[in-house]
Amino acid sequence: MYAILENDSDILAGKVFVNLSSDTPEKAREAAKWLTGHGASHLTGGVQVPPSGIGKPESFTFYSGPLDVFESQKELLEVLTSTDYRGEDPGLAALYYQIGMDMFWTGMLSYLHAVAVGKANGITAEQLKPHAISTMASLPQFIEFYTPRIDAGEYPGDVDRLAMGAASVEHIVHTTHDAGIDTSLPEAVLEIFKRGLANGRGGDSFTSLIETFMKPADHVIEPSRATTSHL
């Protein structure tokens, strides 16, 4: 964005810019502040589909920024996709987008790892497909069940226990190892479970790992910015 607009920053005043680039919420806020400082109006957008999905009725885009600006441009924006306005904070659209990408990439990576384990045991991706789809299709009911408990800060072990989940993940690590497949993904998952156990959460639900995520590990590696900035 800056590479395009900085050389013409003197003509930005009075214009409306919709930032559909993919970056962090903080970068989106910085972009909004920069544009506002030059007299322009700004909306952040988080497009939830690839280019092939543009113009299709089921596609949508998150938007955030000044409500009056969004309302004035809504009809034009809906030519691209349907719109989902998240709020005044210019970083919210990017935040919802990145949260979605968090779930997408971790979910798809688990699928690819499962396929690798299957292939090592003579099971094709096609043979695994209905079972993979069934497993993924079961997730909404868990999300529905756990959401009110999570919002209440309650993680009772009446349905599941973290210790039980840790044992299950350990079995996955051993199964992966026995198949001769890279174990780094399930080992990373097991490490998170172990941190929860170390925090005394063994008898609580595995959803108590939210509290573990809220306290980053001492060895967390600072993410590289080399490939993340598209503004």
What are these model-derived regions, one by one?
Residues V16, S41, F60, D182-S184:
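Proline-centered loop/turn at the N-terminus of a beta-strand
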Residues P223-L231:
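Eukaryotic N-terminal low-complexity, Ser/Thr- and Lys/Arg-rich leader segments
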Residues D10-A28:
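ADP-ribose/adenylate-binding Rossmann-like module
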Residues L92-P216:
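Helical "substrate-binding/catalytic lid" subdomain
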Residues Y2-S9, E71, E170, T207:
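Amphipathic, non-transmembrane alpha-helical secondary structure
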Residues I11-L12, W34-L35, V117:
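A short helix-coil junction within the Rossmann-fold of NAD(P)-dependent oxidoreductases
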Residues I4, S22-W105:
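Rossmann-fold dinucleotide-binding core
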